[in-house]
Amino acid sequence: MNKYYPTYLQTFVLFLIFIPCILISVLLVLPFASIENGIGLSLISIISMLLTVTAGLALRKDWRLKISLFPLAIIFLSVLFIIGLHILLDPLNEIFPAPESLIKVFRALLLQPYAAFFYIVISAPILEEVLFRGIILDGYLKNYKPWQGIIVSAFLFALIHGNLAQGLGAFGIGILFGWVYWKTNSIIPSIILHFINNAVAFVGMLTTPEEDINKSIREFMDNNFAFSMLYAFSIIIAVGSIWILHKKYLSKMSVERAEPKEELTIDT
């Protein structure tokens, strides 16, 4: 039985392709920029991801991406959930702080804020969404049960961040993005949400003193009672936004194209 690209095994091969893509991007960038500054790091990340996305689309033999109209309320409710999720994960961020290697990368990026902005806020959301939702999840939705594909693709999305501090949030957000992609049949909502999430993170990086970059929200507030109230409110926000998102919007959208079928073919 023919299947859509990619299957789980084909995704593993695609991740192996990512390794030489990194090496190629380093060789291309080194003559013009150091890999220790923001411009060099940004260029290497962008080129390696672009090469991987190109390989994925070529192997799929279909360069089209899903684009459909969707209610803007989906963006608003999803942003509320993301805010609530980040607050709910704050205690775990205290237990698993960002590694020093990641802090060094952030410092290098912020030395060239314009390059960092283009990489973090513009290119990363587009390229990562095309790879993880437009290619990987799109294949999973056609080959496997929807929620199985969403969870596996979210795990891979978390894994590529390379550390537990970012991975926890990336997994939760990856599930949200995958759910929205499945129901809306469009890659645009997840790209917009990724833009917003990364833009907020970028502003936080710029405005936070270097010595405080690993501080949790609770440590910034320095008031356990106030943080407890905020934490309780974030539960209400996260649960409420997801409930409304499901009941009023996503549950009413057609998912016919994402259901597993007996026979699947690849467009050529």
Region spans (language model):
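Alpha-helical transmembrane segments in multi-pass membrane proteins
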Residues: 12-58, 232
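C-terminal membrane module of polytopic membrane proteins
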Residues: 197-268
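Membrane-interface helix/loop boundary segments of multi-pass membrane proteins
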Residues: 127-152, 179-186
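Hydrophobic residues within alpha-helical transmembrane segments
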Residues: 13, 123, 152-156, 168, ...
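Juxtamembrane helix-loop-helix connectors linking adjacent transmembrane helices
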Residues: 36-39, 61-126, 130, 138, ...
